[in-house]
Design a protein with these regions (language model features):
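N-terminal exported-region signature
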Residues: 1-191
Length: 191
């Protein structure tokens, strides 16, 4: 709030226990209601929410299962429409929890405080690819790691963008898929 003069003011308001909001196609910035609610309390009768795309921010984007009052979240949709947040358990279609690749290779990039896990080498269906998309990066993030197409998944490799504000950068990998003689994975620097 902004006031022209110094002083104090009383501000009154009521508790928000339910909220219906209109969303655009793509990434949307949202906030919750007056109490913490789980992702299962997002009513999505229009079926526009892309599974696994609710992200909070704490210096880096993190998948979230809850909406905490006063916090902002990115949420991706596949069309415009409405969702409803409610403190009451919903009996309508709820948003599923984040999908994960069972058999894909893993690349974990960390600076000791924040980390992102990227997946590669396993094909996923066109219908679930958007679940591996990330909200827009911005220059003042403390940490971010993603493929250059704003995804945390790449089928056959790709260029990775990293934002890191400290000198430490750790990279761990786990090769799960049997590539046989057909694939060679190499991690190189663009410098």
């Amino acid at each position: 709030l902004r006031f022209d003069d110094s002083g104090s003011s009383d501000i009154a308001g009521g508790e928000i226990t339910s909220l219906t909001m209109s969303l655009n196609d793509g990434w949307n910035l949202i906030s919750g209601i007056s109490s913490t609610i789980g992702i299962e309390n997002i009513e999505d009768n229009w079926e526009i929410i892309i599974d696994g795309t609710l992200y909070g921010y704490n210096g880096s984007y993190v998948n979230s299962d809850n909406l905490v009052p006063g916090e902002g979240y990115w949420l991706r949709t596949n069309d415009e429409g409405e969702i409803t947040l409610s403190g009451a358990q919903q009996s309508m279609k709820a948003v599923p929890i984040v999908p994960r690749l069972d058999q894909g290779n893993i690349l974990k990039i960390s600076n000791g405080i924040h980390s992102n896990t990227l997946f590669f080498g396993e094909d996923i269906s066109e219908g679930t690819r958007a679940s591996y998309s990330l909200p827009p990066a911005f220059p003042y993030m403390a940490f971010d790691a993603r493929f250059t197409d704003d995804m945390k998944f790449a089928m056959d490799g790709g260029e990775i963008q990293v934002i890191n504000t400290i000198s430490t950068l750790n990279i761990q990998y786990e090769i799960i898929t049997n590539a046989g003689d057909q694939k060679e994975w190499a991690l190189t620097t663009g410098i």
